Structures are given as structure tokens and as C-alpha cells.
Amino acid sequence: IQNSRKTTLASVCLKNNLNKPGSKLDSHVAYQLFVEHKHKFIYCEVPKVGCSNWKRTIFLLQSNLNTEASEIEHVNIHHTTLIKRLLSYPPALQKEFLSNYTKVMFTRHPFERLVSAYRDKLLHSEPFYSTTVANEIRAMFRKNTNSSEKVSFQEFVNFIIAKPPHSLDIHWKPMFLLCDPCDIHYDVLGKYETLGLDSDHVLKAIDAPESLQYPSLKRYSSEKRTDGDITLEYLRQLTSKQIEKIKKLYEMDFFLFNYTTK
């Protein structure tokens, strides 16, 4: 599986001229990369693709497994200073780690990831998104800006397609822009769709202790995970023009990681 994923990726990179050999690692990308030295592991964080659980896993790898994954709060895992970003090291070390460590990134169907981001960030009450971002969206699309009605999926999509891809929030920025897989040669290209298999493969590759399992914790446990059916329900709210525009926005993600726009 890995070989075919890597082959597809490499040929799409070439065909679309996405390789920038010899250029300096983009600091935005270095910010998305987490380093775990004990097992020489680098993980690229793609939000909405099981990243909280990968961060929990890195935390456990570092801490000799003396805690349970379920004890690590969602909020804490994203604000801990114990998990180091590649960006916090000088460029020479960044290079060294990138050449010697096992590098991993996970992807998810672009439409499913988009719906998951909308459900998680705009339908829940995380103040930055449900207030700040939501108000920015309301201001763009509503005549009556005082209305406190939740931002609709259509408004959310219009908001995203109105911006340049590079400037998008990491929760909905195209995955290839977050992790630069054409220049960083990931050793494992995992998929959310085959998360169990792929995470076992990663843990074996980095020689993790056998007792460590990738956790399947979920932040809002009462809700269904965003799956294909839920994604379709949301996509049906969009016009064909909007769908064409999000296809275009995530076009490289579809090609590089071999997802179909079904």
C-alpha cells in the first residue's frame, strides 16, 4: 500500500511541478511538524485527521507510558510544551532530523475533512471559532450582522473559497500546503480511512513499545464521527458551482493522495 501511495504522490508532484528542491523548509510547514526524539519520529499535524490522538501518542512515547491516553485532556494536548515542533530547532538541526527520522503524515478525504472542521469548529462553542471567525463570516454574507444564528455550511464554504489557499486556517487549509509532501519525503503516508492499519504500521516502524496502541478517543463523544453519509448531507446543501470551487481548492489533495471526488 505504501509503495503505491508514494508512487502516486511522486508522479503528481512531478507532473504539477510541485517540487522545490534545495529550498529552505517553509516555517509554516516546520510549525506543523512534531518531533519525538526517543523513537526518531516526526509527525506532520493535519487537523481533523486524528491529530489529537497522534499528539497523545507522541506524548506517551516520550513519557515512558506512565499515563493513559484517555487521561490527557483534548485542550492540554494542543497546548503542551512537552511536544516539540520542528520549528523550535535551528535550521541545521531541522535538516538533520528530517534526513534521519521516520516522517509520517496522515490524510483524509478533503470533503469529509472540510465537513468535520465545520462541525467541530463552527457548530461547537470554542470561542475563537464560534465567535470571532463566525462573526467574520456573518459580516461577509449577512445584511443583518446582529443575527446570532449559527453560520451555515454554505456561508462557511463561501468564506473559504473567497480567500487565497495559503492564508486559510489550518483546519481547512489544503493538506499538501500544511505538510509539503513533495519536498519532504514521508516514510509513511497514512490515511484516516485506514487509520487502524496505518497507525499500527507507524508504531512498528518507529519501534514503539508493544503495549502502546493508537487511541481512538473522540472530543465530542456523544456525536457521530463525520463519515461519508454525514458529509453527503452537507454537500447536498451546496450549489454545483460551490462544489466545483471546493474541488478546485482541494484539487491537489485529491490528486496527490488519490481521493476521488465521488
Locate the predicted segments by residue.
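Membrane-interface amphipathic segments in extracytoplasmic regions
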Residues: 1-262
